[in-house]
């Protein structure tokens, strides 16, 4: 043997009979091969190689064997010798400390080793030890035997053939023998491992298996060294490249055209590959022919295995290649590798993240080696016959740029020359063959699911791998980045994932235990489809949907899937093909993305429209179907399943559904796939979700950063940068989505960009190669990938919307973003997010126990020193929702809460949820107002004192507020005001202290409002800065402003509450007592109270004092309303400033834009001028210069147009943005104002006006939670109580009214006695339900007696009354009434009264007589005398004490001057603290209550009979809509002179009817009906005034058995007459008849009782919400006089805008014993009425009549207007119909005229042709007049002849011509007039000639007419002259033209055309004479104007005409 053969290394290849392909790698002859010893004889002797003179020893590649199968030549794709998983971080190298250098030297005993080292150094730059064949045999001999049992092949099929050294070749394998020297394919590559290194590469999830191969088995055995103990020893590693490779950066499988990696001698590479040959996600592979190979150093044994699965042996029917690098075999059957000399290798191996496990696998000589599988497509061969390769190393690919060698085609095996440049590589023209499927499948891959190995690892894992040389890599296909918007479901799931991880995101700890990476992976999976993260959403989204709707909903649930649907639809429609690449992402709770896509494509496009190559056995079939079937347009493929074996005939689009964090990895995987035809049309479309981590990853890729370095170490800062991108934007959009009322899973938070994306996508696909740049892209971005980085001139979609500050740290960013949010998830997840540790609950969190008083709450770890109410939930979320939303075990940061302030109005119906419309747009304020719920007023139970938590919160807030006041430098007064205001808020509202920012905002806002109240100047901006800096507050200005606006609305209420503390109905601070205990006891016992003299002066003073307090009270409510309006005005001003600022910014941007484009245009103009000057100078030729200048102008015009178009687009876009911003501001303003109005509306209704110390009245169980307080004023002689309702003070003159306020205490257990006083008000007040006003001007000489109702004081309150020691003055007469409370809103209103009674005080008719004032109480007539007050109250509680209804009470009292009577609702409001009591001033002689009546219902009837000088009966009844009417005790005014018996009445009415029935002198009786009150919103407070009456009347006690719902009060005024009174009342119950006691008479003596039957009380106002009156009801009274019914004053106050609605109910005792008074009047049988004149009655009657007349007038005018409208409409319709007919007739006339003109033109053509034939005489030579000239003349004449009307045919028919018919019948046309002044001449077509010639005989000739084809040609005949047709006799014919007279005889005969009567053959045209033609050409016609004068003349025209 030769010397070089002895030194060389020998590689051996083993083939089976079924082998179909050779080693797909070119062999590089770097070292000679080693010959192995004889079979079975181990030897350490170096085997010399074959002859060194082999032609292919160094230059030619090693032989690549091929074999035939099924008649086709199949190439064996070379698996990478160094394969690693896509997730591997490090290459685990098996480093054995065992072994010695002696073992290595044992294999290197050849004396010529030193010469070989030089060759080794040439390629590896280091000395590689040479191993003998014995080393290889020792390694594989026993190992390959064990795999023999796994091979399912017969001995014939497995017969081995030795190739390379020509030892054994099977006889039947001719292909192998004949092609041993064939080079490997051009694109095949291999990797080289150094000597003594064993590389085991395996995927993550699947076991490494050894499979049987029945067809194709290739075994490459590199030399190894066998030691005596059967161990394999490798040489130490000395190349630092080893560490780089072992770091897990380069173990990648090169693509089909990628560079190969050389494995140096001495290393065994064991690698497993899934059929798709997945490649590491982060590996930058190189293209062929451009890259340098990279080699592993000598002495490294690399065993790479993944973490998840054990190393197994499996069977596989594909191909398997085993690469055996030289190792050293020892005697103990172990593989020994020398330790690496570089210790950094071990450090790198150990310091990896643990994603790849270091595995030490002993390679036993007999079994272990054969059990290791390197490629899933190949199997280990059996047998001991190992054929050594001719080379000691695995050949490098031909793609290496230093190799210019012939290659072999992959398909046809033709040898071809390949240069180093892959772009210039020749492509074989052979047709790609289908991929053959394996015939014998022994064991398929797992069919239970797709691949989940490390190559199939979820997309979230970041791969750390380095490419060999990424700087030389560039993409083959153009790539476009396609933006996709998240759907609503994805948006919520994305934000929910971030929200659930808020604790770890905002943490400062650097040890997160993988929480950040887990969050990153979760949000990336969400971007693909929400089902990937949570499969339970499928049930939620598809609930209650039809079957055909489910697919659409699931598609729209993912923005990517929705866009993919559109893209694939377009692709299928246009007959294109696409490959969809996806990442195999899956979670335990979700679905696999591949299955989702497969179901989608199958259902949407049909089962035959796609292929999905998941499994090994089905992948080849799927690819073949995709290539063959025309209907199959989609191929689904996992990104890492791409391999060089996949060959597609055509693919127009590669769609990347999911992306890696390093986008270049996806491109490298995709480019492994080979496109055989039209590959230049293939484009890559990468879908990315905007404003998410996917977009941020692309931004990083575009920033020219090395991606392998950017994502190599996914550190904390990079993870935060990815997660922070777009988070704020998405949370803002989440607020929009949650604010919408109709959730939709589609893209709804912004206008979808899908249409624009699809348009650009279709444009790119339709463009040809090289035209991509011509497509103008706005949404899609073309990314240029070169040298491992991306570059682009455009920005991504989200970069225009997101401005992320780099200065803000991540923890601050997440704290601000997530700290104040508490979203209500619309798509809650059933699987909460996993948490690394259990979070400690903060006190007050949702998980804390809900205790009533908060005292039993377990102590927990606190986040701060704040105290939280344990019952706080905002908004209330049940456990299921909390678990579903992932907030079950979150702390304060995980589940933030919102501070809430809720009013006490529980009846408002709010449920604590945020109204979506109100929350919309608030994020634009710059903070999180949207996080603060709209319902900022929590309901407070007014029946209970504040609970323990609120009191404890108050205790905690006091020192906090004190500290804040100190920091803000507030004065002592302001600090005191802060404490008072805080106390008020705590008592009336519920405050929560979560989240902390809102709680801090509340504190600052409280200090602001306190400073405002004490008028201390406090800068809001400065105070906020101080609080944030000194107290570490983190609240924003917007939050403080919002809460401050709410507190501002409470300012006036707080002031009223503060002032009300000094007014106490039982308070000792009142210097003057009002009620005597003795009098109270007497009142309760039924004793008679003596008449007391009333001092007029004291009454006037008390009236003034009462008026003053009323004004104050109304002022408070008016102030509250003004505060609300002021707050709203401030909001409007604030937004107005923002709008102005926005407009200003818009104008600035617009001007900047215009200036920019103006500059551009100026630059272009300058450039154009310069270029034009250059052209003028350089171009000497004029033509060239002009052409160049024109071209220059054209080019610049196009540029100018482009600039203009671009400017217009930018301006339009700017305007749109401006409009959107303005719209958003308007929506924000409306939202804020609406929320303030809603808050204020509920607050005004339910605001408590409390008296200071009346809390002892809150003991009833029936008390309403919304019952307001009653404020009581005590002055010198008066106790005033005001009903707590809303009224507005108007500035018109006030009408005095009688205010009868009826009320009871809450639950009836306690009642309060109030005194009726005189009140005078000069202002017109809107008085609500239970308020009445009366103005009294009493004179000392007048007498007035007032009957007052009973005073009901419960027994348990008598001690309190006794303790007061109050005394009743003789000058006082007081009525005690009880006010009712209700939880209903006060909706009844009293209309404003415009009449003035300011002169009432001057009237002498209403003077009070103190001596005659006597009130006596009659208890004899009552049926239940024995009941005391307690029994009455108890019975009331049992039967009718309901606070849910309202009782109106009205009383129209007689007043002196004419005025309107204002009736008010008889319902007052009261809460547990007190009641409103309306004083009634009166001149009482005495009073005595009688509680003996039996109360069975809530109705009460009172009769008032004042006596006046006049006599007029007025009956007024009150109504109200009541649900469960409460009882009202109404004080009535009278001037009694005697005692009257108290009648008994059984009243069943449903409303309170207060009827004043004065007797009228005349027979007229006036009935006042029910009428409503004004709207609630116009009333801010109630003015409680009493109207004194100077009338003398009586009031009887009513022992009523009341079954109705309301109180009926009847006031009877005795008059001189005795007219029947018909009262309008309320509807009654089924019992229509009522027993009534006789009404008292106003007479000096006692009168017998009279029975009053009240029947048929009907009130329509109960059911109608807006009504001004009620129907009249009859009140039958037994009296001798006639009965007169008067209609009610139904419309009395309707004109003033009366509106009726639910009012406040009043609960009063039903039994009142009113003292009867004796009045000196004449008795009347049965019911005598005294004579009484009352000016009020006259005024009321007048107003009633005016109202009726007004209504009648209105109806009449309305009917007149309606009739007028109908009449005018009929006239207008008739007029337009007439105009329509005129236009139509005009149109028809014009159409007829046009038709006539058209027919005339046709006729003139015929005549012209006839003249042409006639004028051509035979005398004229044919050559004398050219035919063309004649035709020109004819055309000119045609223009002139069109102006003439032809009438000659009718005239010529009457002549005696031989041919009488001038024209044929079919040619006779209608005539129409032309606008021309003269008739139109004849219109010849060919030419015009004279009408006559010199020879009349010529007229006898017949000529054919040529120019116009006609059914028959016109003939010209000579007509004998007759007198009728001569010019003298017939004016229709004219003489010939003057210039033709020389050619005419003396008697010229006119010509006429006639239709031929006989068939005359047409003849050719001839010309008469040359002179005629010349004359026509030279002379103009002189007689044209004269020839146009006649309609029937034949005109002869000259040539010019």
Swiss-Prot record:
The keyword Metal-binding applies. Residues 357-448 form the 2Fe-2S ferredoxin-type domain. Changing residue 1765 to D: In CMM2-mut1; lost multimerization and transcriptional gene silencing (TGS) activity. GO terms for molecular function: 2 iron, 2 sulfur cluster binding; ATP binding; helicase activity; hydrolase activity; identical protein binding; metal ion binding; protein homodimerization activity; SUMO binding. It is found in: Nucleus. One of its GO terms (cellular component) is nucleus. Its main location: nucleus. Residues 1945-1962, 1971-1990 have a biased composition (Low complexity). Residues 103-126, 189-204, 269-280, 292-309, 863-872, 880-891 have a biased composition (Basic and acidic residues). Residues 1734-1815 are annotated as: Conserved MOM1 Motif 2 (CMM2), required to mediate gene silencing maintenance and necessary for homodimerization and interactions with PIAL1 and PIAL2. One of its GO terms (biological process) is regulation of gene silencing by regulatory ncRNA. [2Fe-2S] cluster binds at residues 400, 409, 412, 430. Residues 1993-2001 are annotated as: Conserved MOM1 Motif 3 (CMM3). Residues 953-1044 are annotated as: Conserved MOM1 Motif 1 (CMM1). SUPFAM superfamilies: P-loop containing nucleoside triphosphate hydrolases. Residues 39-53, 92-102, 1528-1540, 1915-1929 have a biased composition (Polar residues). Changing residue 1736 to P: In CMM2-mut2; slightly reduced multimerization and transcriptional gene silencing (TGS) activity. The keyword Hydrolase applies. Residues 563-722 form the Helicase C-terminal domain. Its EC number is 3.6.4.-. Residues 19-126, 169-207, 243-311, 441-468, 841-893, 1466-1517, 1528-1547, 1624-1644, 1915-2001 are annotated as: Disordered. Residues 693-722, 1130-1168, 1194-1217, 1736-1785 form a coiled coil. Requires for the complete maintenance of the 35S promoter homology-dependent TGS induced by T-DNA construct insertion. Homodimer. Interacts with PHD1, PIAL1 and PIAL2 to form a high molecular mass complex which mediates transcriptional silencing at heterochromatin regions. Binds to AIPP3/BDT1. Together with PIAL1 and PIAL2, regulates transcriptional gene silencing (TGS) independently of changes in DNA methylation. Required for the heritable maintenance of transcriptional gene silencing (TGS) in heterochromatin, and particularly in the intermediate bivalent heterochromatin, characterized by an unsual methylation pattern consisting in hypermethylated DNA and histone H3 'Lys-4' methylation (H3K4me) together with depletion of histone H3 'Lys-9' methylation (H3K9me), in a chromatin methylation-independent manner, in a non-CG methylation context. This is Helicase protein MOM1. The gene is MOM1.
């Amino acid at each position: 043997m030769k010397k070089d053969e002895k030194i060389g290394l020998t590689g051996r290849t083993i083939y089976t009979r079924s082998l179909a392909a050779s080693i797909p790698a070119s062999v590089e002859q770097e070292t000679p091969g080693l010959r192995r010893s004889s079979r079975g004889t181990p030897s350490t002797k170096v085997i010399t190689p074959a002859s060194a003179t082999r032609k292919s020893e160094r230059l030619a590649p090693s032989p690549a064997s091929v074999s035939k199968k099924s008649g086709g030549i199949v190439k064996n794709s070379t698996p990478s010798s160094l394969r690693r998983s896509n997730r591997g971080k490090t290459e685990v190298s098996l480093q054995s400390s065992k072994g010695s250098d002696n073992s290595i030297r044992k294999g290197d005993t050849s004396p010529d080793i030193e010469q070989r080292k030089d060759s080794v150094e040439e390629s590896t730059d280091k000395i590689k030890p040479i191993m003998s064949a014995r080393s290889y045999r020792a390694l594989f001999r026993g190992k390959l035997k064990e795999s023999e049992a796994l091979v399912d092949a017969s001995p014939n099929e497995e017969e081995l053939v030795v190739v390379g050294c020509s030892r054994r070749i099977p006889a039947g394998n001719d292909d192998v023998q004949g092609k041993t020297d064939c080079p490997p394919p051009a694109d095949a590559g291999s990797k080289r491992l150094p000597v003594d290194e064993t590389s085991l590469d395996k995927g993550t999830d699947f076991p490494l298996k050894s499979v049987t191969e029945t067809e194709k088995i290739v075994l490459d055995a590199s030399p190894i060294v066998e030691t005596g103990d059967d161990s394999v020893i490798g040489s130490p590693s000395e190349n630092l490249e080893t560490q780089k490779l072992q770091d897990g950066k380069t173990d990648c499988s090169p693509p089909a055209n990628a560079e190969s990696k050389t494995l140096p001698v001495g290393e065994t590479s064991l690698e497993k590959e899934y059929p798709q040959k997945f490649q590491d996600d982060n590996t930058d592979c190189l293209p062929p022919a451009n890259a340098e190979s990279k080699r592993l150093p000598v002495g490294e044994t690399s065993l790479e295995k993944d973490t998840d699965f054990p190393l197994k042996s499996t069977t596989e029917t594909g191909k398997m290649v085993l690469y055996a690098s030289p190792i050293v075999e020892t005697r103990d059957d172990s593989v020994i590798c020398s330790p690496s000399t570089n210790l950094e290798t071990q450090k790198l191996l150990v310091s990896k993240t643990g994603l790849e496990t270091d595995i030490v696998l002993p390679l036993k000589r007999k079994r272990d080696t054969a059990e290791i599988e390197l490629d899933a497509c190949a199997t280990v061969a059996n047998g001991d016959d190992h054929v050594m390769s001719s080379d000691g190393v695995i050949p490098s690919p031909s793609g290496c740029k230093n190799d210019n060698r012939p290659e072999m085609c992959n398909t046809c095996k033709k040898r071809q020359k390949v240069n180093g440049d892959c772009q210039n590589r020749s492509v074989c023209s052979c047709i790609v063959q289908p991929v053959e499927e394996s015939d014998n499948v022994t064991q398929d891959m797992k069919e239970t699911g797709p691949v989940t190995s490390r190559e199939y690892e979820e997309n979230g894992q970041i791969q750390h791998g380095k490419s060999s040389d990424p700087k030389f890599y560039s993409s083959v296909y153009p790539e476009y980045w396609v933006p996709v918007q998240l759907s609503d479901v994805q948006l919520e799931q994305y934000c929910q994932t971030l929200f659930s991880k808020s604790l770890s995101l905002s943490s400062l700890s650097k040890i997160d235990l993988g929480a950040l990476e887990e969050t990153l992976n979760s949000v990336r999976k969400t971007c693909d489809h929400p089902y990937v993260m949570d499969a339970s959403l499928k049930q939620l989204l598809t609930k209650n949907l039809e079957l055909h709707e489910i697919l659409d909903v699931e598609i729209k649930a993912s923005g990517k899937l929705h866009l993919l649907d559109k893209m694939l639809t377009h692709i299928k429609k246009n007959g294109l093909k696409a490959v969809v690449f996806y990442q195999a992402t899956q979670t335990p709770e979700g679905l696999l993305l591949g299955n989702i896509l497969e179901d989608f494509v199958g259902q949407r496009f049909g089962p035959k429209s796609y292929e999905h190559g998941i499994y090994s056995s089905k992948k080849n079939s799927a690819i073949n179907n995709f290539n063959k079937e025309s209907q199959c347009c989609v191929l689904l493929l996992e990104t890492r399943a791409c391999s060089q074996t996949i060959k597609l005939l055509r693919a127009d689009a590669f769609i990347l559904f999911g992306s890696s964090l390093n986008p270049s990895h996806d491109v490298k995987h995709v480019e492994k796939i080979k496109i055989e035809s039209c590959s230049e049309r293939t484009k890559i479309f990468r879908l990315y979700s905007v404003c998410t981590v996917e977009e941020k990853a692309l931004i990083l890729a575009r920033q020219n950063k090395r991606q392998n370095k950017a994502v190599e170490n996914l550190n904390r800062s990079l993870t935060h940068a990815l997660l922070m991108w777009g988070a704020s934007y998405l949370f803002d959009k989440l607020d929009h989505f949650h604010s919408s009322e109709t959730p939709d899973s589609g893209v709804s938070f912004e206008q979808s960009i899908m249409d624009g994306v699809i348009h650009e996508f279709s444009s790119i696909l339709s463009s040809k190669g090289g035209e991509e740049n011509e497509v103008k892209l706005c949404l899609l971005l073309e990314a240029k990938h070169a040298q491992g980085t991306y570059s682009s001139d455009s920005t991504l979609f989200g970069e225009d919307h997101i401005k992320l500050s780099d200065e803000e740290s991540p923890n601050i960013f997440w704290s601000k973003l997530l700290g104040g949010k508490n979203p209500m998830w619309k798509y809650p997840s059933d699987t909460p997010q996993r948490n690394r540790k259990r979070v400690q609950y903060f006190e007050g969190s949702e998980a804390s126990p809900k205790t009533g008083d908060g005292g039993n709450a377990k102590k927990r770890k606190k986040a701060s020193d704040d105290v939280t109410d344990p019952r706080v939930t905002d908004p209330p979320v049940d456990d299921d929702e909390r678990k579903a939303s992932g907030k079950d075990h979150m702390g304060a940061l995980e589940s933030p809460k919102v501070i809430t302030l809720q009013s006490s109005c529980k009846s408002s119906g709010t449920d604590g949820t945020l109204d979506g419309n109100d929350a919309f747009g608030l994020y634009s304020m710059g903070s999180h107002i949207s996080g603060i719920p709209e319902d900022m007023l929590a309901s407070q139970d007014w029946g209970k004192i504040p609970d323990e938590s609120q009191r404890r919160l108050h205790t905690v807030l006091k020192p906090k507020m004190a500290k804040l006041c100190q920091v803000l430098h507030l004065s002592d007064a302001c600090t005191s005001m802060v404490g008072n205001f805080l106390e008020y808020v705590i008592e009336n509202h519920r405050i929560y202290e979560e989240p902390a920012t809102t709680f801090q905002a509340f504190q600052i806002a409280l200090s602001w409002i306190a400073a405002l109240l004490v008028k201390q100047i406090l800068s809001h901006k400065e105070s906020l800065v101080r609080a944030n800096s000194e107290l570490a507050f983190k609240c924003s200005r917007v939050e403080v402003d919002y809460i401050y606006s709410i507190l501002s609305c409470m300012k006036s209420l707080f002031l009223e509450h503060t002032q009300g503390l000094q007014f106490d109905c039982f308070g000792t601070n009142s210097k003057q007592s009002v009620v005597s205990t003795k009098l109270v006891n007497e009142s309760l016992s039924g004793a008679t109270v003596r008449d007391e003299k009333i001092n007029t002066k004291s009454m006037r003073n008390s009236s003034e004092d009462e008026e003053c307090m009323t004004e104050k009270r109304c002022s408070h409510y008016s102030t509250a309303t003004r505060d609300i309006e002021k707050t709203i005005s401030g909001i409007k001003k604030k937004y107005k400033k923002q709008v102005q600022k926005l407009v200003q910014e818009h104008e600035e941007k617009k001007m900047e834009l215009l200036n920019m484009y103006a500059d551009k245009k100026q630059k272009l103009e300058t450039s154009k001028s310069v270029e034009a000057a250059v052209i003028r100078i350089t171009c000497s030729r004029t033509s060239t210069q002009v052409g160049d200048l024109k071209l220059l102008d054209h080019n610049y015009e196009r540029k100018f147009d482009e600039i203009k178009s671009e400017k217009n687009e930018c301006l339009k876009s700017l305007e749109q943005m401006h409009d959107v911003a303005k719209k958003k501001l308007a929506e924000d303003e409306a939202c804020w104002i609406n929320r303030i109005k809603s808050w204020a509306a509920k607050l005004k209704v339910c605001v408590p006006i409390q008296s200071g110390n009346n809390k002892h009245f809150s003991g009833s169980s029936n008390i309403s939670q919304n019952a307001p307080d009653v404020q009581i004023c005590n002055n010198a002689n008066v106790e005033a109580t005001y009903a707590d309702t809303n009224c507005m003070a108007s500035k018109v003159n006030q009408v005095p009214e009688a205010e009868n306020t009826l009320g009871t205490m809450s639950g009836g257990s306690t009642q309060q006695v109030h005194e009726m006083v005189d009140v005078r008000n000069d202002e017109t007040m809107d008085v609500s339900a239970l308020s009445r006003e009366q103005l009294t001007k009493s004179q000392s000489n007048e007498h007035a007696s007032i009957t007052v109702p009973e005073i009901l004081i419960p027994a348990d309150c008598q001690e309190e009354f006794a303790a007061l020691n109050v005394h009743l003055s003789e000058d006082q007469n007081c009525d005690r009434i009880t006010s009712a409370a209700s939880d209903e809103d006060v909706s009844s209103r009293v209309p404003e009264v415009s009449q003035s009674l300011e002169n009432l005080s001057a009237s002498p008719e209403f003077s009070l007589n103190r001596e005659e004032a006597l009130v006596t109480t009659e208890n004899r007539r009552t049926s239940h005398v024995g009941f005391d007050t307690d029994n009455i109250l108890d019975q009331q509680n049992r039967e009718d004490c309901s606070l849910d209804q309202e009782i109106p009470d009205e009383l129209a009292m007689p007043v002196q001057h004419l005025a309107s009577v204002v009736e008010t609702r008889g319902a007052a409001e009261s809460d547990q603290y007190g009641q409103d009591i309306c004083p009634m001033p009166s001149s009482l002689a005495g009073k005595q209550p009688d509680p003996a009546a039996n109360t069975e219902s809530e109705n009460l009837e009172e009769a008032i009979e004042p006596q006046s000088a006049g006599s007029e009966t007025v009956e007024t009844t009150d109504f109200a809509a009541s649900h469960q009417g409460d009882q009202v005790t109404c004080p009535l005014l009278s001037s009694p002179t005697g005692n009257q018996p108290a009648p008994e009445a059984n009243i069943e009415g449903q409303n309170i009817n207060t009827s004043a029935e004065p007797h009228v002198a005349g027979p007229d009786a006036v009935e006042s009906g029910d009428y409503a009150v004004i709207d609630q919103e116009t009333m801010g407070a109630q003015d409680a005034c009493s109207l004194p009456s100077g009338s003398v009347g009586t009031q009887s006690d009513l022992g009523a058995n009341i079954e109705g719902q309301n109180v009926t009060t009847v006031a009877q005024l005795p008059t001189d007459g005795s007219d029947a009174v018909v009262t309008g009342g309320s509807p009654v119950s089924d019992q229509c008849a009522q027993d009534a006691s006789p009404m008292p008479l106003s007479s000096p003596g006692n009168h017998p009782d009279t029975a009053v039957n009240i029947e048929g009380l009907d009130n329509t106002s109960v059911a109608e919400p807006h009504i001004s009156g009620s129907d009249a009801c009859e009140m039958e009274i037994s009296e001798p006089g006639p009965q007169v019914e008067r209609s009610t004053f139904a419309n009395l106050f309707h004109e003033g805008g009366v509106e009726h609605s639910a009012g406040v109910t009043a609960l009063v005792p039903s039994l009142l014993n009113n003292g009867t008074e004796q009045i000196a009047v004449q008795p009347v049988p049965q019911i005598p009425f005294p004579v009484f004149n009352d000016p009020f009655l006259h005024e009321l009657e007048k107003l009633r009549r005016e109202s009726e007349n007004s209504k009648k007038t209105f109806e009449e005018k309305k009917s007149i207007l309606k009739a007028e409208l109908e009449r005018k409409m009929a006239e207008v319709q008739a007029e337009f119909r007439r105009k329509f007919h005129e236009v139509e007739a005009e149109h028809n006339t014009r159409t007829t005229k046009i038709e006539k003109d058209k027919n005339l033109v046709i006729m003139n053509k015929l005549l012209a042709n006839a003249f042409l034939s006639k004028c051509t005489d035979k005398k004229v030579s044919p050559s004398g007049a050219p035919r063309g000239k004649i035709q020109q003349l004819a055309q000119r004449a045609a223009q002139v002849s069109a102006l003439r009307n032809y009438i000659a045919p009718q005239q010529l028919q009457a002549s005696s011509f031989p041919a009488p018919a001038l024209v044929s019948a079919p040619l006779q046309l209608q005539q129409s007039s032309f606008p021309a002044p003269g008739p139109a001449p004849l219109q010849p077509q060919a030419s015009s000639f004279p009408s006559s010639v010199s020879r009349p005989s010529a007229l006898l000739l017949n000529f054919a007419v040529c120019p116009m084809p006609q059914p028959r040609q016109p003939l010209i005949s000579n007509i004998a002259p007759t007198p009728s047709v001569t010019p003298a006799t017939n004016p229709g014919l004219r003489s010939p033209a003057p210039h033709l007279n020389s050619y005419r005889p003396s008697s010229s005969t006119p010509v006429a055309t006639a239709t031929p009567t006989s068939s005359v053959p047409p003849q050719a045209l001839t010309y008469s004479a040359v002179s005629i033609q010349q004359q026509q050409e030279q002379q103009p016609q002189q007689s044209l104007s004269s020839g146009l004068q006649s309609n029937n003349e034949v005109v002869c025209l000259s040539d010019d005409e």
